[in-house]
Amino acid sequence: MQDYLVRAVASDGNFRIFSARTTNTVEEARTRHNSWPVATAALGRTMTAALLMGANLKGEDTLSIRVLGDGPLGAIIVTSNAKGEVRGYVQEPQIHLPSTPEGKLAVGAAVGKGHLHITKDLGLKEPFTGSVELVSGEIAEDFAHYLTTSEQTPSAVSLGVLVDTDNSVVAAGGLILQLLPGAGEEVLEILEQNLRQLPHLSSLIKNGETPEDIIKRVTKGIEMKFLESNPVGFSCQCSRERLENLLVGIGKDEVTSMLQEQGAAEINCHFCAENYHFDKKDLQRILKRIEEKD
């Protein structure tokens, strides 16, 4: 099944909900970064949250997320856009921690204490950045805290990544439910009860439930209007051309030094782990471009 995201709104306009299946997206990130289970779960949850929040973006708007904890994972960096594209990496993808007493991956301990920073570039003069302290490092709670405090939109967030014994991703997905002005107590009570009874998202997705099925579970007893659904996936904007322009930008001295010391340059994209090799001829051509520009 292809990964995709669904939007829905209560018929009376009291709340909106976004739900996504991201299994293939998270598995691609795992494969590219060769990440171990706890890093896969942390990165996968963050990427899923980025896609769900990206559902509110338009046109060329972008979203950048930094989870900066003091745990062994280091930083988690993710970007998404209005087209349902996401990319991301974790600073230390190969760490192992014992499971929690409940048998879960110890994502909170791996992330540690710190801050969540979210930057939205909406094409205005300055991007908007909001920051909150991490509540638990489990990612979903941290995003709910951010949306409720920094964006003043009471929100419930559920994110799940299920990893197999061979480290591959079995299921991944998430949902964000946001109350809108005028939401009454009765609706709140129904939603809270439904959310309490909701099984783990990753197990629902593993069993074949779709984002629509999950929305129906969460909103049982409330009339809903389903809006559009859109494909989502891992996509990096890096390219050989972009990195060549980067080399042009660092200047003559740096490129000359690369030529003299290594005779080549190797550049790795953090986001997608793609390697780009520039040999002696490439660097000489780049040097010529710099000289022509100067």
Curated annotation (Swiss-Prot):
Gene Ontology annotations for the cellular component aspect, listed alphabetically: cytoplasm
Record-linked SUPFAM superfamilies: Hsp33 domain, HSP33 redox switch-like
Domain of life (superkingdom): Bacteria
CDD domains in the record: Hsp33
Record's keyword terms, sorted: Chaperone, Cytoplasm, Disulfide bond, Redox-active center, Zinc
Compartment(s): Cytoplasm
InterPro entries recorded: Heat_shock_Hsp33, Heat_shock_Hsp33_C, Heat_shock_Hsp33_N
Post-translational modification: Under oxidizing conditions two disulfide bonds are formed involving the reactive cysteines. Under reducing conditions zinc is bound to the reactive cysteines and the protein is inactive.
Disulphide bridges, residue numbers: 236-238, 269-272
A GO biological-process term: protein refolding
Gene Ontology MF, one: unfolded protein binding
UniProt similarity note: Belongs to the HSP33 family.
Function: Redox regulated molecular chaperone. Protects both thermally unfolding and oxidatively damaged proteins from irreversible aggregation. Plays an important role in the bacterial defense system toward oxidative stress.
Name of the molecule in the record: 33 kDa chaperonin
Recorded name of the encoding gene: hslO
